[in-house]
Amino acid sequence: MAILNNSVVLPVEYGREIIRGVLGRSKALELGRRLPDMRGKTYKLNVLSSLPVAGWVKNGTTPSGAADEIKNKPISDLAWQGKDLVAEEIAVIVPVSLNTLRDVENYVDIVPEITEQVVGAFQQVIDATIFFGVGSPWANFNGIVADATTAGATVSWNGTSGTSFYNAVNDAMEKVENSGYVPTAILGGPSLNSAFRKTITELGVLAGDQGEIGALPRHIDVTGGFNQSTAFAIVGDFRYLVYAFREEMEMRLLEEATLVDPATGSTLYNLAQQDMVAFRFTMRLGAAIPNPVNRVSGQLNSASTNIVASASAYPFAIITKTAGGSN
């Protein structure tokens, strides 16, 4: 174990274990697309913002005295818009009494006991931020639910049994498809299972028995970061949720620090005075929704020379549950 500035650096194998736990349980990271690790704080994504338009070569003219007709080929171009992936830090400090540590052989033995809770804390904040924008550290990143709402990609479900939820899922898929994307999953909290069990397709088949609606894989988020009162479910092309790590998990064992309340500045723990140590976990990552222009939902510009993005195009749609609906 390495000692640095009165702190203990987490052995590599424990950091990897925590990363595997976060990746395996955070639905945002499981369903999204991981990009290569960032080499700096900011990674520039080149997102297509304008597509070329091709056309038949016609409307030629024959100059006076010329034998052959001259035809002009249409001119168009490509354009890209930069989108930044910015690495921001997630952190948690876990104070532990020295009396607890005295019951084990060394400090590292307590790490597996803490790991499970650290994984849970990290996965909850990641999912809550990416899906709902809670505490978002990234400029202009409001979360998938807020951006889908702005794009008009919302479907209301009344919470009843029968075909209503089946229809709501198909309507949400249609919104994604009309935007030029292919839905890859439906995501919700635990109550999504109940909605499937009570759902009957147009053919009278229980969708819950099939496990899918429209061949769309079902995923359940149990991190505590999915607020079903805001959005009951998210349907989308999760390939367009991208993220990258700047630094994977790091842990240091603080032995002589004073921990203060971030809100008030008042002292919470004086580790040396109170015979305590604290495990400090940190991780840095960035996330973004590229949403490039495509030929399905794109629109011709005023000069009809390029295809530009539609304001209503978005790779995700949400299903909301109306008040009074039971499930």
Regions found by a protein language model. Give the residues of each.
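Extended oligomerization regions of viral-like shell subunits
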Residues: D37-R39, K44, G143-V277, M283, ...
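Intrinsically disordered or highly flexible coil/loop and linker segments, enriched in small
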Residues: A28, L51-A54, Q123-F131, G135, ...
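Short intrinsically disordered coil segments
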Residues: N59-A67, D109-P112, E202-L203, V293-A303, ...
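Alpha-helical scaffold segments that mediate packing/assembly in large oligomeric complexes
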Residues: P74-I75, A91-V176, N306-N327
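Protruding loop/beta-arch "assembly-hinge" segments enriched in small, turn-prone residues
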Residues: A2-A28, R34, N270-N327
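Short helix/loop capping segments that flank catalytic or ligand/cofactor-binding pockets
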Residues: V53-V57, D103-E105, A195-K198, A288-P290
